[in-house]
Amino acid sequence: MEKFELKESATTPRILINSKKGKIKLIGTSTLHNPEEFYPKVLNIAQKYFDKPLEETKVTIDLDYYHQNSFNYIFQFIELIVGLEKFKRTKLKMMWHHHPLDQGIAEDIALISKTLDYQIPTMSYELVS
């Protein structure tokens, strides 16, 4: 698999896994009614990259909203990504973008960072109309 891309919808995030360039993106909203039917398939596809990662992997996360059921799978996804660097299988360049006033996402990032003992870099932004 060189590239897997799932376009964003009203309830699913855009997911990009580009094995040739070492890029992973998770962008948008995740409010699926049945994330247990969606995310395991995505994790299986991602595992193909995780089995043979490039020397450097660039990860961009920009989720503007997700519910708790999706969060559990997002956590698993990030845990696998962070594991690549912890086991020295890739040099990880990760950035999680979020709105500065979104306390829920900021708290989730802090929780994931603490749980995985890995400081996830963040960048806050404000949408300009």
Question: Which residues are covered by each model-predicted region?
Answer:
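STAS-typified acidic loop motif
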Residues: E2-P40
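A cross-taxonomic marker for long C-terminal extensions/tails that follow the last structured domain
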Residues: E2, E107, S113-S129
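Amphipathic alpha-helical interaction surfaces in cytosolic regulatory modules
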Residues: E37, V42, K58-I112
